């Protein structure tokens, strides 16, 4: 993104290498690249609201050290994901990054039905450990976008996650089968188009 697009600001979660179990300060390369391209790096804080286009982006949670408390080392970093809600003209878009079930449950406990969203970006590329039933019950998404590569080594999206999304009644859009997907919100109607398929109403 930074190499190919003009990015004014980069929003990142607080990073605690010791709490996360990581031995290296992995964000340093990213920060150096941001500086090289003149991109401002902003450390997110829960509850902060940023103006974005005609709407606002709210940081719901991300990076709290207590979310690192897990036996799965890979989940340490995943649970540091920023969870954000974009709102504009009756449209709501929820993104939870790679957050695992523990971080999702914290969201549910803190915000409940205020997490309702028109469009939800499936957690962790459609992993079985994200997009839990508890979260979907409060989000009640009209449509879900899954970002994952074709025939990826991780098996994303997982069949269990797909079943939960289907049971939630959401239209499912996948980059592995559809390529780049563009969502449009107009006249209170969400539509989706991809490089490989015709426009489809969600």
Task: Identify the meaning behind each predicted range.
Residues 1-202:
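Non-globular, low-confidence helical/coil segments that flank catalytic cores
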């Amino acid at each position: 993104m930074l190499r190919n697009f003009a990015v004014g600001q980069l929003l990142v979660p607080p990073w605690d290498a010791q709490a996360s179990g990581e031995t290296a300060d992995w964000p340093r390369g990213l920060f150096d690249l941001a500086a090289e391209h003149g991109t401002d790096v902003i450390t997110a804080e829960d509850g902060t609201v940023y103006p974005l286009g005609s709407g606002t982006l709210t940081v719901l949670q991300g990076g709290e050290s207590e979310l690192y408390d897990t036996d799965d080392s890979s989940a340490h970093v995943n649970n540091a994901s920023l969870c954000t809600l974009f709102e504009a003209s009756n449209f709501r878009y929820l993104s939870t990054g790679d957050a695992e079930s523990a971080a999702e449950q914290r969201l549910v406990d803190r915000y409940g039905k205020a997490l309702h969203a028109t469009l939800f970006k499936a957690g962790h590329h459609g992993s079985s450990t994200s997009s839990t039933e508890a979260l979907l019950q409060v989000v009640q998404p009209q449509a879900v976008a899954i970002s994952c590569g074709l025939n990826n080594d991780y098996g994303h999206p997982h069949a269990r996650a797909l079943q939960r999304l289907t049971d939630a009644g959401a239209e499912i859009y996948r980059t592995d089968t559809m390529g780049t997907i563009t969502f449009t919100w107009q006249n209170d109607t969400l539509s989706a188009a991809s490089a490989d398929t015709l426009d489809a109403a969600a």
